[in-house]
Every structure is written in C-alpha cells, then in structure tokens.
C-alpha cells in the first residue's frame, strides 16, 4: 500500500500558503475580534489586545513576539511562618513575617493581602455553598514595624490602617514603598479548617488535615494590571508571586506532616530507623515503606520528645506553601531521576506519598509513590526538567479528583490504579503550569488547566499506551474530545477567554480542561507536531518564574511558527464557534473526481482529506484554512478518476474536534455520510 501527499487545485482559486509574520511589524489591533461578514459567514478579525497590554508593550515590559520585554519585572516576597495545629480544638493558629520587595517602577501606597479562609466566613460571596467556620480571626496586623489599626479606608491617602473586604485585606501604609525598596509585614491569625467536603481544595477529617491557602498572602502586582485583587469565591483558582518560605509547623506527637519544600532538621521529628529508611532510597527508583501497615502506628516512626513536634520546611522560588498532617498515615518514598540536558547531569527528586490503609484508597500502596515518580520523569522529558528537590502526593479530605500546590498534590482515596495514575499525572503536571509558568488562573483557567490536560494525555499515552482499558476517560485525547463535542453539540459551550469566575459552572471543567486540550490538539494539527512542541517549550522557557498574559501565549506560537494565527485564536478562544466540515459530494467530472467539501460550522480550519483508491493506494489532500477566509461555504477540488476512488474521509486522524463525524466520510456505492 502506498501513500503520498498532494494539495488539490481549488476551483478558481490557488492554494494559499499561510503568510509568515514579518519580524515584529504586526500592529496592535484594538478592535473587538468580531468577524466581518463575507458571503453570509463571519470571518474572524485580528486578535483583541487589551489597553493594559498595549501600555505594557509601550513601557517595554512586554513584546509582541511573545517574549518578556527588556524592562520586564516581577515582585519578590519572603514568608517566615510559624503555625500550630490543635486537632482537639480543630484550630490552626499562626504568625508570620512577610518581606515584600518592590521591583516595579511604581510607588505603592497600599498593599492588598489575601485572607482566603474568609471564604468560609458568614456573608462572604461564593459561587457554591461551603461550610461556615467563621473565617480568619486577626489578632495582629503590623506594617513597617508598627501596629496597624483596623479602620475605614475611604481613600489611598491618610494614616496607616487596614480594612477587610471578605477575602482581601487592604493595608494603607504609613510610608509608601518606593521602587527598589522593601517593606515588612507581620500577622497573627487563627481559623478553623472547614470539614470535608469543603471546597474541593483542602479541609479536615477526623484523622487528616490539609491546609491550602491558609496564611495571609500578598496579592500580585504585575506590569499589565497593577494590583490584581479578584476576590476568592470558590470558583477560579489563584494568581501568586514567586516567593521563598521558611515554615515551622507544630502538631501533636504521632502526627506525620507532608508539605511543600524540604524537611529541615529531620532528626528533631523522625527517629533513627525512619531516617535510615529514607537514606536508603535516596537516588534509587525502588519504592520503600517508610511507615508501613506492619509498623505500630505513625508515632513509632517519630521522635519521642514532648507532646508536640515542630516540623521545619523551607522552599525556594515557589508561589505558595501547603501542608497536610495525619495520625494514621502510611508513608512510601522513592526517587525520580530527571536528566538535565542543559547541564549534562541527572537530578534526583525525592518522592513522598502519604495515604491511609483503607479499601477506598487501595490503589495508593500500589501506585502512590510509583505513579508520582513516573509522572515527574515523564513530564520532565516531555516539557523540561522538574526544578525542585522533592515532590509529595497526599491522600485525604477530597471526595473527587485532586488539587495541586507547589511540590505537592492532594488526592481523593482512589481504589482504581489507572485512575490514580491519571489523577496524579494531571496534578503533577501543574508543577509546570502554573507553578513555574505563573499565569493568572483567576481570570484565565485555560492557561493552566487546558495545557495541563493536554500534557496529561501526552504523558499518559507515552507511559500506558492508547487506547487503555479502565482509568479516567478525560486523561486521554479521545475522552477529552468526546466530553467537549458532546456538550457543544447540545449548545453548551463558552468562549475560552471568558473570565474564569464568570464561566457557567457546568462548563468550567468541560471548556477550560477538555475543550482547551482539544484546541491545542487542533493547533498541533495546523502548525505540525514538531513546531507545536518547539513553541510549547519556548513559551515555557520565556515565562518560567514570570506572569504570562494570553497574548504572550498567542504571540509566542506565532513567533515560533512564523505564521499569523489570528483566525485560529479568535475562532477558538474569543468565540464559541462550532467546527463542522462535511463531504458535500464526490462525483465524476471528466477525467477527475470532483470532491466538494462544505463548511457547515463557523470555525475556519484546514481540511485534511484521505482518498483511498481501488489499488490500495492512499492520497492525502490538504486545503488550507485561509481558503475559508474569503467567505466560502464550500470548496471543490479534483483528483484523477483512475484508479477508482473507493473512500473519501475528512480528518481521518481525528486532529480536529469536529462536532459531527457522521458527515465526514463518503464511500463508493454507499450513502454519502
């Protein structure tokens, strides 16, 4: 059987190659990306560029090639935190010192601090119901070395004071923070962690506590938007600056703690036998039982001094810090070996897995540590090397799915091993997006969830093959495609550029996760596998430890591919347009077979035809997307009539998320479908 590729002659029009972008000459379009109408169909216009982004380009902090500008900056923060968990009172108390460095060119007169546990305070706005715990109790607020009183903030000027607006506290400073200067803040606070199930991201059970967004955290001040203070309402996730953490967590003796960062002074909390077990697996891919079901409880693995133990962790260059504690945890550990091609070395990443001995969590002793190790190694190969010294996966408090934090994932108690593997792959994938490439999840969930969903499918296919029996359908491209197309066929779709908290709840997962993943598959089909992968890696290289805007993602892919893809971005991101390409007819026309393709949807996409002949040969025919931009609804092309054409199929490789596969195939002697 032979195969060859041709581009068919389009009736009356030449086939147009995609026009390359001139080097940094594309103007900044400010109009709405609504389509102009040609021949009754909408034609996507240029990508909308926000005024804030245009101003950042003018200020030299952004560049329309997708690179950070020469004057790009981010702020820097350090957190020193001491926290205590009292399970008998179901209470967490803490105190912290924050050092905030203003690396922007602007003078800051007020600073907003997130108090996200106020989601659980009476009267706080929220998208879904949650347990009411009372929220955060502040017992001390200090800025620039002096106590700050609670007051009404009617203006940016005036004496120092603070006011709490649900999940955000604004502090008006006694002295503005000039460019290049730093300011210190101190807080003492307490709260009751919500009972599980709470909000799907943290909580408590009788024997497990997991603390996410648990401490006062400075909001992001960036070069595009200034202070970003979207309230936390239990819909969209987060937007955070990179920071350094030094955290001490005091828990009752017998409770094991896992956390973001590296455990320091381990001899103060672990006994000699436990430390020997950890040392024995350092640099090895074997899985070791640090605390096993045959051990006499977690307390036997710990130091025996006093009624409490203080676990000390440090983490460098992470955007957040989370931790979990349990008094019935088993603990497995191993090592991931991550080749670092740039240095010609292999990095060792310590892998920790904490889980309870239960039928509901039956997959964890089989795969908790192993799947986490495999995810780190595979994603490091697909993307770029994992940068931190450890990774922890923890079972508990969630009733569905998982949640990501730097160097840490929280999971439901999976019993099915392949489902656990997929869940761990997805949440571990977030260690790249957004934990390194720090997009604003609060506004653009697709930038981390969609990319991670796409990367999950690639890594799962590499490790476990495809199709697979069992597991979660959304961890593979076919399942992602089915999820999106099923919803869209029923009219349930939204533009991906819809701000995250404004997404209809029934579409948040379908569109931000699965639709985006399928749009990336389609983009790969448009620009080619190798170009797509180069652009993805380049986007990560440019924006690791930085805050990309959607325009930076779009511009990077155009810059790397050398193509103007405005029609693609507008169609798939700014509009909820359907794709429906159909075989209109296949008829004899002299010495040729005339193949008419109809565009019955709205998205202009390339047409990839597979023509199968009677001698077994296969001809691949392509029509560029630009042909639809003239307003056409149908295009007719021709191939030689001999050898006889037996079958014509659109997109045989399922590269594009077409809503109606039933009209994409014609078979000789049969009904057109």
Predicted regions and their residues:
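Beta-strand-rich binding/interaction modules
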Residues: 258-259, 586-651
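Solvent-exposed beta-hairpin/edge-strand motifs
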Residues: 108-153, 252-255, 612-622
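Glycine/proline-rich low-complexity spacer/linker segments in large multi-domain proteins
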Residues: 123-134, 190-245, 266, 331-336, ...
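A surface-exposed beta-strand-loop module
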Residues: 34, 39-40, 91, 101, ...
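Short, hydrophobic/aromatic-enriched beta-strand segments in well-ordered soluble domains
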Residues: 96-98, 102, 113-117, 173, ...
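Hydrophobic alpha-helical and helix-loop surface patches within well-folded domains
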Residues: 23, 43-49, 53-62, 313, ...
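N-terminal, polar/Ser/Thr-rich
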Residues: 24-93, 205, 566-567
């Amino acid at each position: 059987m032979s195969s060859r590729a041709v581009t068919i002659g389009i009736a009356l029009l030449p086939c147009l190659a995609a026009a390359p972008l001139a080097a940094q000459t594309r103007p900044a379009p400010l109009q709405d990306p609504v389509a102009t109408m040609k021949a009754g169909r909408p034609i996507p216009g240029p990508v909308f560029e926000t005024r804030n982004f245009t101003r950042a380009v003018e200020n030299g902090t952004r560049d329309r090639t997708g690179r950070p500008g020469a004057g790009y900056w981010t702020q820097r923060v350090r957190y020193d935190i001491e926290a205590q968990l009292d399970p008998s009172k179901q209470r967490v108390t803490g105190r912290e010192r924050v050092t905030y460095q203003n690396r922007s060119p602007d003078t800051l007169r007020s600073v907003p601090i997130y108090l996200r546990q106020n989601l659980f305070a009476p009267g706080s706005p929220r998208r879904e119901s949650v347990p009411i715990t009372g929220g955060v109790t502040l017992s001390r607020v200090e800025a620039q070395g002096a106590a700050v009183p609670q007051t009404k903030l009617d203006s940016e000027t005036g004496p120092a004071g603070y006011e709490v607006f649900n999940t955000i506290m604004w502090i008006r400073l006694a002295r503005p923070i000039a460019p290049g200067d730093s300011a210190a803040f101190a807080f003492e606070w307490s709260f009751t962690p919500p009972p599980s199930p709470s909000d799907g991201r943290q909580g408590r059970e009788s024997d497990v506590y997991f603390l996410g967004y648990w401490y006062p955290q400075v909001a992001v001040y960036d070069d595009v938007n200034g202070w970003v203070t979207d309230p936390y309402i239990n819909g969209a996730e987060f937007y955070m600056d990179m920071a350094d953490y030094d955290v001490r967590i005091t828990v009752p003796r017998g409770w094991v703690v896992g956390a973001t960062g590296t455990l320091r002074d381990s001899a103060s909390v672990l006994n000699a036998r436990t430390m020997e077990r950890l040392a024995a697996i350092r640099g090895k891919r074997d899985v070791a039982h640090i605390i096993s079901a045959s051990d006499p409880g977690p307390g036997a693995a710990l130091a025996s001094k006093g009624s409490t133990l203080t676990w000390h962790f440090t983490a460098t260059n992470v955007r957040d810090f989370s931790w979990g504690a349990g008094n019935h945890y088993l603990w497995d550990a191993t090592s991931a070996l991550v080749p670092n091609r740039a240095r010609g070395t292999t990095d060792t990443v310590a892998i920790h897995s904490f889980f309870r001995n239960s039928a509901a969590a039956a997959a964890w002793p089989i795969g908790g540590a192993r799947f986490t190790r495999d995810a780190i190694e595979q994603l490091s190969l697909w993307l770029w090397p994992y940068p931190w010294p450890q990774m922890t996966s923890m079972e508990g408090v969630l009733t569905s799915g998982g949640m990501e934090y730097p160097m840490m994932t929280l999971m439901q108690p999976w019993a099915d091993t392949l489902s656990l593997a997929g869940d761990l792959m997805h949440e571990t994938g977030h260690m790249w997006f957004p934990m390194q490439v720090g997009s604003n999840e609060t506004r653009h969930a697709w930038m981390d969830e969609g990319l991670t969903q796409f990367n999950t499918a690639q890594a799962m296919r590499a490790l476990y093959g495809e199709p697979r029996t069992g597991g979660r359908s959304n961890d593979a491209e076919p399942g992602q495609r089915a999820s999106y197309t099923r919803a869209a066929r029923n009219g349930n779709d939204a533009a991906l550029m819809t701000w995250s908290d404004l997404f209809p709840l029934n579409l948040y997962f379908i569109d931000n996760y699965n639709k985006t993943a399928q749009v990336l598959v389609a983009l790969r089909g448009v620009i080619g596998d190798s170009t797509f992968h180069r652009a993805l890696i380049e986007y990560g290289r440019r924006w690791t430890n930085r805050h990309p805007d959607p325009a930076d993602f779009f511009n990077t892919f155009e810059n790397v591919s050398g193509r103007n893809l405005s029609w693609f971005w507008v169609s798939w991101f700014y509009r909820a347009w359907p794709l429906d390409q159909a075989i209109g007819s296949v008829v004899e026309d002299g010495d040729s077979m005339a193949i008419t393709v109809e565009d019955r949807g709205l998205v202009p996409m390339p047409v990839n035809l597979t023509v199968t002949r009677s001698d077994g040969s296969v001809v691949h025919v392509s029509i560029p997307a630009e042909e639809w931009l003239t307003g056409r609804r149908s295009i007719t092309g021709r191939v030689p009539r001999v050898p006889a054409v037996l079958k014509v199929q659109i997109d045989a490789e399922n590269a594009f998320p077409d809503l109606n596969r039933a009209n994409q195939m014609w078979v000789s002697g049969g009904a057109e479908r």
